[in-house]
């Protein structure tokens, strides 16, 4: 992989800039957009970016930082899932707290936004409080977003309890978008102002990158990633008017800026120092780019990856036709084809050959995997194991220079697992998935040195690219993610079964 981003330079520049911003206030409320941990989108489009860069940045500032986590009551009530981890938002709050503590960061509290006594949310509040975590309940803000006089009054932000904080930087984060981070920050500004404290607000949003051209693939990749939110990158007209400089922001921030500026001015009783939405941001990621061509190519690959993901989401019913059509338009805008992703054609060609040989109507499930040396291997589904498991076994054999003829896993281990699935669990599909095969491999490695050598090659798969001709099961998708493999799928189910495809 060609490196296009200097992680150390970015960390230095970013931490310095945040500290400069906080110098103007007694306290800075810093709204953190995107992912604090495991930001694989940023890692993919900025080769060299550390997926945990943001949390390492906060760790560097830990003496000055405390964290408030927001979650929208409605998201808890309807069990909203965080797609990259496959866990509900309430569980992700617990995960966030544990992970933040690992980095020695103080978690001040959890804020339940737009709370109206929802039963499942009340249970979650009880769970947190009984584990010693402070919880604040915020209602919907009366008058929001247009009636500024009501918003900035005792009927608006004044209805919310004040969150007691002690450190100069308060990071406000959440499991996902629409969790009420901005409202929480502004509510705190209102209460701080009432107490005579000089508090400020800033936003840390990695994408779009404000000092990279509007139609740069890096910024278009952000549109592809947020196609379901209908985010559109735009030139910041407010910044142009104020400074005669071209910067990029996204539609929601630009559209909400006039109201946001008025709210801040009403709270502070003075003119805002911010002349544009770009001014509000503290993002310095653009200054870490050291090879623009590498970033462009990586971003184009991410656009294709997002196109496939949206296609599968549409097939599953998670995305509407408009969203899928928009992802197609983004592909066309950058003049990209599905087959510009190297692993797509080998997977489809292998699948077509198998279909001709078996004379079946259904698409043959095949997974193609590109290794770091450019070698592309394939794996097909069989009665023994599925395509994802097969390609992983083929890959570690190749990396360990083990002949195809040699079995890594003894039938003595495989047969009892298959019997357990068929006879005890009464499962219809008894072929082993990726996790089951790797578990069997780890057992074999205890007595088989060849299996042990192959096992040791698994870390080399991190960062590899894969493509499947059919939608992978949730189990395989999760396992490949844990291995650090970026996988895409054609939007086809492996069979006509409705329930047994999951």
Curated annotation (Swiss-Prot):
Record InterPro entries:
DUF1846 (IPR014999), DUF1846_C (IPR048441), DUF1846_N (IPR048496)
A single Pfam family, by name?
DUF1846_C
Per the record, the domain of life is Bacteria
According to its UniProt record, which protein family does this protein belong to? Belongs to the UPF0371 family.
Name of this chain's protein: UPF0371 protein CLL_A2797
Organism equals Clostridium botulinum (strain Eklund 17B / Type B)
